[in-house]
């Protein structure tokens, strides 16, 4: 009895370690959203021009997730995590030292390389190390690391950038990553590659219409979200006319609400993943459509950001659950594809927001994002009725 108890504690501790790593990786992915104005000022550029960095980062991840995963499919996972953290840390040092926007983009590409591998293996590792029957909860814990990156990492990174310069934000992330690396070395066991799949897995996965439908849903809904979210900081200051401090508070609210979404999914995700995801997409649609009307009031924007954060966390978790349920025999390949497709959506959304801001008006980003959100809602209803599946069923 004691052994089992200790075993469960150790299992959860390892999952928590991965959650901390997720926090670090998502902090660096999200933090430029809160630093666009500062970086633009530093390099004498427009905010929308700097925003293209978000698209470059996301599309590098999208392009490299599957190739890197296949290249490292036989590498022991603990060793792989250590190596990618070394690349991650070195790239942040370069971000700190960057003397031009081009160098900053190059450093972000290095981070994106590490990101591409990390997110293709993390979800399956969390499920693998979780106590029996706690797979959805393990995923929820990883997602909590993601949410904390938004509720703590992004606002703190923005505050550091405001008071000490945006370079110090990236340097601080590098320090945090180094500490996390030491923890990984200490706590994680040897993790031989299991069920990672190979290039031979791709035709099999592509012949699963339910899985392909989930991938399509993912890219559409993520595009909708990032069309507006990528430029929420300049939107709050330049369109709504509120202070930089309120922009920080709004990002804090949105991230904190993500934790609520994580808790909701942890309790209901095993049984009601499909219904939760469709409801969350509908909620996202409403939030995007109301973004500009809500911009006349700090309270209205605050309430909207809470529902927005809840919706996106449930959507992200739900998509992962579906992918893992539909590809239990090739989890790493399936998640590498998912990570790549998710980042195609991030890059597409950031690019659409960039073009809307440059050639139309930044005030329209919510309305434009609502269009793919509506398409995603209809598609989710169709596919979830046709292919209902939960994580615990592990149905192909």
Swiss-Prot record:
Q: Which GO terms describe its cellular component?
A: plasma membrane
- UniProt topology in membrane: Multi-pass membrane protein
Q: Where in the cell is it found?
A: Cell inner membrane
Q: Which domain of life is it from?
A: Bacteria
> Does the entry feature the keyword Transmembrane helix, yes or no?
yes
Q: Which GO terms describe its molecular function?
A: carbohydrate transmembrane transporter activity
- TM regions (residue ranges): 15-35, 50-70, 81-101, 103-123, 136-156, 170-190, 209-229, 246-266, 275-295, 299-319, 333-353, 364-384
Q: Which CDD domains match?
A: MFS_NepI_like
Q: What name does the UniProt record give this protein?
A: Probable sugar efflux transporter
Q: Which gene encodes it?
A: sotB
């Amino acid at each position: 009895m004691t052994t089992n108890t200790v075993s469960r504690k150790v299992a959860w501790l390892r999952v928590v370690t991965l959650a901390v790593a997720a926090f670090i990786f998502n902090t660096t992915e999200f933090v430029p959203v809160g630093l666009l104005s500062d970086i633009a000022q530093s390099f004498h550029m427009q905010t929308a021009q700097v925003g293209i960095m978000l698209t470059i980062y996301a599309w590098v991840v999208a392009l490299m997730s599957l190739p890197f995963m296949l290249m490292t499919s036989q590498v022991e996972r603990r060793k792989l995590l250590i190596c990618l953290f070394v690349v991650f840390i070195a790239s942040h040092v370069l971000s700190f030292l960057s003397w031009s926007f081009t160098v900053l983009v190059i450093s972000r590409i290095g981070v994106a390389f590490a990101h591409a591998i990390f997110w293709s293996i993390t979800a399956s590792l969390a499920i693998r190390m979780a106590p029996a029957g706690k797979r959805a909860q393990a995923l929820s814990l990883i997602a909590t690391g993601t949410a904390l990156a938004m509720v703590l990492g992004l606002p703190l990174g923005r505050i550091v950038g405001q008071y000490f310069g945006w370079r110090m934000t990236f340097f601080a992330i590098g320090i945090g990553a180094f500490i996390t690396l030491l923890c990984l070395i200490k706590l994680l066991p040897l993790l031989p590659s299991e069920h990672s799949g190979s290039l031979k897995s791709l035709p099999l996965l592509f012949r699963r219409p339910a899985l392909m439908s989930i991938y399509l849903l993912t890219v559409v809904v993520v595009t909708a979200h990032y069309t507006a979210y990528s430029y929420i900081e300049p939107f709050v200051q330049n369109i709504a006319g509120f202070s930089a401090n309120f922009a920080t508070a709004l990002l804090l609210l949105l991230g904190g609400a993500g934790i609520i979404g994580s808790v909701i999914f942890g309790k209901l995700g095993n049984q009601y993943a499909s219904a939760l995801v469709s409801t969350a997409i509908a909620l996202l649609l409403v939030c995007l459509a109301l973004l500009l009307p809500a911009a006349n009031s700090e309270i209205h924007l605050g309430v909207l950001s809470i529902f927005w954060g809840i919706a996106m966390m449930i959507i992200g978790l739900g998509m992962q659950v579906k992918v893992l349920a539909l590809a239990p025999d090739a989890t790493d390949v399936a998640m590498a594809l998912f990570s790549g497709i998710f980042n195609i959506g991030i890059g597409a959304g950031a690019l659409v927001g960039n073009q809307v801001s440059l050639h139309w008006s930044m005030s329209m980003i919510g309305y434009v994002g609502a269009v793919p959100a509506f398409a995603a809602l209809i598609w989710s209803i169709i596919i979830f009725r046709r292919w209902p599946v939960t994580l615990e069923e592990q149905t192909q």
